[in-house]
């Protein structure tokens, strides 16, 4: 399955969804599972507020976690199986495209696969087969 994701500073955008690029971590299950990602024994509410603008989006795991949430939302919208293989199409700003391309690909495609998590209480098991990177704004058109 091909999924285009725009990792913006303000919002994460896919073909069917747009939600704020903020994330809040909890050590316990929040009062609602709406927009909640469970990963690595922690809970993350996705789309809450905004995170500070980072010069390097790979500085922490926030954009990776938001990517998992975006993939889960797209899988749910498309009625696809929650255990599947995914190719991500993502954009990078032109200014850092050549410099960040390899590291952003590795950031979005971990060496430990498949990736298991829960989103809104639903278990997912994904194999991220490939990450295709394009100049920002082009990924939606390319895949």
For the regions a protein language model found, what residue spans apply to each?
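Nucleotide/phosphate-binding catalytic cleft detector across ATP-hydrolyzing
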Residues: 1-143
């Amino acid at each position: 399955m091909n999924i285009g994701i725009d990792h913006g500073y303000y919002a994460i955008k896919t073909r069917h969804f747009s939600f704020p690029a903020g994330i809040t971590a909890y050590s316990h299950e929040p009062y609602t599972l709406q927009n909640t990602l469970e990963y690595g024994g922690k809970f993350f509410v996705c789309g809450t507020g905004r995170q500070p603008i980072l010069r390097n989006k790979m500085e922490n795991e926030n954009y990776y976690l938001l990517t998992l949430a975006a993939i889960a939302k797209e899988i749910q919208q498309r009625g696809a199986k929650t255990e599947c293989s995914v190719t991500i199409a993502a954009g990078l700003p032109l200014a850092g495209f050549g410099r960040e391309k390899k590291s952003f690909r590795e950031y979005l495609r971990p060496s430990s696969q498949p990736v298991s998590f829960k989103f809104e209480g639903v278990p997912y098991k994904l194999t991220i087969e490939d990450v295709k990177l394009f100049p920002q704004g082009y990924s939606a058109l390319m895949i």
